[in-house]
From Swiss-Prot:
Role of this protein: Isomerase involved in the biosynthesis of carotenoids. Catalyzes the cis- to trans-conversion of the 15-cis-bond in 9,15,9'-tri-cis-zeta-carotene.
Gene: Z-ISO
GO molecular function per UniProt: 9,15,9'-tri-cis-zeta-carotene isomerase activity
TM region(s), chain numbering: 95-115, 137-157, 172-192, 211-231, 269-289, 339-359
Phenotype of gene-disrupted mutants: Lacks carotenoids in the dark and exhibits delayed greening when exposed to light.
EC number: 5.2.1.12
Record's catalysed reaction(s): 9,9',15-tri-cis-zeta-carotene = 9,9'-di-cis-zeta-carotene
Main localization, broad class: plastid
Residue interval of the organelle targeting sequence: 1-58
Record-given protein name: 15-cis-zeta-carotene isomerase, chloroplastic
Broad enzyme group: isomerase
Localization of this protein: Plastid, Chloroplast membrane
Amino acid sequence: MAVYHLLLSSPPSLLLLPPSPRRPNLTLIRRIPAHPRLGNSTSLLSSSSPVIRKILVRSTLREDQPIASDSESSPTLLIGEDSAAFELGKQKLVSWVYFGVVLGVVLFILNVVWIDNSTGFGKSFIDAVSNISGSPEVAMLMLILIFAIVHSGLASLRDIGEKLIGERAFRVLFAGISLPLAMSTIVYFINHRYDGSQLWQLQGVPGVHEAIWVANFVSFFFLYPSTFNLLEVAAVDKPKMHLWETGIMRITRHPQMVGQIVWCLAHTLWIGNTVAASASLGLIAHHLFGAWNGDRRLAKRYGEDFESIKKRTSVIPFAAIFEGRQVLPEDYYKEFVRLPYLAITALTVGAYFAHPLMQGASFRLHW
């Protein structure tokens, strides 16, 4: 604080002193809080001389915080969160034990209340939707529409719900309603994916299977950017609405939408019938709405911080990079060499080889 008063009271000659030759060459600058006498320090940094900028930056940061260089090539100020950050040393064994217990309890309840045809309501729900029309395409769209209304509706009510019952209770409510509906939609798609009218047949064309496999594999790196913290998903940790900025978010601000579109196009190309096309139409429409709704909710929650991130990111993949609004760090690849992405890689490969098991389990439900 003393440096502020020194800056205001010192003669001009003091401000013209050359910078210290030992000034560190660092790469990151943090947001500088406003000072009651100087106002917004970030505006002073942009309008003052280089020497004044150095004094202001040094006076508002702790000694252990880095200072940016004056080079125009310095990385952009990081406002949001570092996605996929996972520090093993900060993990608590008891939290993961709780996670295992919660997961087991949820799966047990889901099986009794929804999956098991002798006790659950899943089959009755599927039959009710299917009886609306004899068309599997219509049933597929109806299932997606019901899920979309519930899922996006509850997401829009998150702020109100968390104030009324708390973050953890609202997450349990959100998952408890969304999970059975999502599972019903997935199982129906697996069981009826080859119904309907065939539009094209490319499964015997050389190279198509490999291209579809790669597209599906890549899609999962986009699909789950906000579920890296599984402890929040299970409400072991207090759930938060995150403002991610690094990793996949540099490529697109809505990776889940992009991943879903890639997944839908790949599966529709491979299956090639009207049921797959209707499923893709419904899922893509839902995620396009989700992208708009997500921006609206983040803008409401984070205000100017979100608007700043919005200016240097894009919905269309790589658009902000090509336009120069997003500058990738030289070591950008390190934002992907992290345990959550390794876990996604393993789970995606495992899911591919587990396709026969998932199909067999779905067939046995007769949904």
